[in-house]
Design a protein with these regions (language model features):
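Long, charged, glycine-rich C-terminal linkers/tails
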Residues: 172-189, 279-302, 360
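SMC-family hinge/dimerization module
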Residues: 189-220, 230, 292-315
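Amphipathic alpha-helical transducer elements in NTP-driven molecular machines
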Residues: 11, 43-49, 64-67, 95, ...
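Extended, Lys/Arg-enriched charged tracts that mediate electrostatic binding to polyanionic substrates
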Residues: 151-201
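Non-transmembrane, heptad-repeat alpha-helical coiled-coil rod segments
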Residues: 237-271
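Conserved amphipathic alpha-helical "coupling/scaffold" segments
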Residues: 1-149, 153, 258-261, 265-271, ...
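Extended, charged coiled-coil "arm/hinge" scaffolds of SMC/Rad50-like chromosome-maintenance ATPases
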Residues: 124-141, 228-249
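ATPase nucleotide-binding head domains, primarily ABC-like/P-loop NTPase cores
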Residues: 285-288, 293-457
Length: 457
């Protein structure tokens, strides 16, 4: 992130935006969002946010919950790989979310919006969604109805298990084995049905020992009368695994055949999620859509710093770039000077990200290719004062980079040195920046700088 954007606290706004998203792709996109210095790109971004803002007002927000990045899974499937049950369910979940978004959009049929292209890139696939859901019940469970063969295998398996239980039930109820059994229960060891036998009565129960208790007092025996039935179950379980693998392969092949449209749909849905999150942030901040221009003009009406309590923040009116290109803000310490220039800078960056701004309607924001800031920290919201040396290093770096498409914000210009020298230095810096065509907002407590501002256009 640009260090000037950090000093203006844009990352905090983007963090708040990211917390309003529903999917990881949109969250990461929010956190990495960069202001654009291109007028038409900013116009496009704001138009998209406006479209979502209007749709939310009329129909409420669509749900993006459950959207997952399945690009890797789809790539594997389209290359012939077999997906797990969890991976197939993730694809089905995305298809459900996409279907839900398109159904929500149908409420506004006939409305033309700036985000129609994204909505039109959502491809529903109820066929694949249902096919996966009808076959896969959970991460580890395949439905009996996934295929006729699987249903038949499991039916035979249940019959064999029932026969074994009947035989073992008869055995544990028989007086013949009452004294031999540790408990009158049927359990399993190594996937085979066994009964718990007292170790000292081991010879009284014919069968195969599969396990011994920790104390050695109990042995778990598979009685001879059920060995063949247990063997048949093992064969059926092997066939069951093979059939499940075949079904997973078939479903994966189906998913792979639709990989391209699903990827496009998921990408469009994630982008829509970000746009609607911008609109929801606007509602949260009671923000409005700024009027943007490429003339370097900023006209803010009752603007508020978005990170301050709106009940306590003092709104400001700002005019810069129309009648004059430099704005010098004066006043005592703790008078709100730093917050004022931070507000100018942050709202500019927000607009360039496609975000509405906390200001009255018809406020104007210019699109700048670069926004530079040297924020002194006496009035900083959270950080400490930088040294004069660091302050001047930043000023020099800014001076070397500015042009007529730049906005420069400087807090306590010339502070940290002798007042007379500091005032002279401040005037020289402003003259240099003005000569290069930059729009400037600076704060100061030097009376000389106030006088300079009054006699300068």
């Amino acid at each position: 992130m640009n260090k000037y954007h950090i000093s203006l606290e844009l990352p905090k706004i983007l963090l708040t935006l990211s917390e309003m998203t529903s999917c990881e792709e949109a969250r990461l996109a929010a956190l990495s969002l960069q202001p654009s210095g291109d007028f038409f790109e900013v116009q496009k971004r704001l138009s998209e946010t406006e479209a979502a803002h209007i749709l939310i007002a009329k129909f409420g927000a669509p749900s993006f919950g459950g959207l997952i990045n399945v690009n890797n899974q789809l790539s594997r499937a389209s290359s012939g790989g077999t997906l797990s049950m969890r991976e197939l369910l993730d694809i089905s979940c995305d298809l459900r979310v996409i279907r839900g978004i398109t159904e929500w959009r149908s409420k506004s049929a006939g409305m033309d919006t700036a985000i129609d292209d994204l909505f039109n890139s959502l491809y529903t696939n109820k066929y694949l969604e249902d096919k996966i859901n009808n076959a896969v019940l959970s991460d580890t469970e395949m439905s009996d109805n996934a295929s006729p063969a699987l249903k038949d295998i499991r039916r035979h398996k249940r019959l064999e298990e029932s026969k074994i239980r009947d035989k073992l039930d008869g055995m544990i109820r028989s007086p013949k084995y009452k004294s031999s059994l540790q408990d009158a229960i049927i359990t399993q060891r190594n996937g085979r049905f066994v009964v718990p036998v007292k170790a000292e009565h081991r010879s009284e129960v014919s069968g195969m020992v599969h396990d011994t208790s920790g104390s050695g007092a109990t042995v778990f025996i598979e009685p001879a009368v059920v060995i063949e039935a247990n063997n048949r179950i093992k064969v059926l379980e092997s066939r069951e695994r093979d059939e499940i693998e075949r079904i997973l392969s078939e479903l994966s092949e189906e998913a792979g055949s639709f990989a391209d449209t699903i990827k496009i749909s998921c990408e469009s849905a994630a982008e829509l999620n970000l746009i609607f999150s911008k609109a929801q942030l606007a509602y949260k901040m009671k923000a409005t859509m700024p009027i943007i221009n490429s003339r370097g003009v900023i006209e803010l009406k009752k603007a508020r710093h978005p990170l301050l309590d709106p009940k306590k923040a003092v709104p400001i009116d700002v005019s810069l770039g129309d009648k004059y290109d430099s704005l010098v803000i004066t006043g005592p310490n703790t008078g709100g000077k730093t917050v004022s220039i931070k507000t100018i800078g942050l709202l500019t960056l927000m607009a360039e990200c496609g975000l509405f701004i906390p200001a009255n309607e018809n406020s104007s924001i210019a699109v700048f290719k670069n926004v530079f800031a040297d924020i002194g920290e006496e009035q900083s919201i959270e950080q400490s004062l930088s040294t004069f040396s660091a302050h001047m290093t930043t000023i020099v770096n800014i001076s070397n980079s500015v042009d007529e498409s730049s906005l420069v914000l400087i807090d306590e210009l010339g502070a940290g040195t002798d007042p007379v020298e500091g005032a002279a230095l401040a005037v020289a810096v402003l003259e240099d920046l003005r000569r290069k065509g930059a729009k400037i907002a600076a704060t100061t407590h030097y009376s000389e700088l106030k006088e300079y501002a009054l006699r300068t256009n």
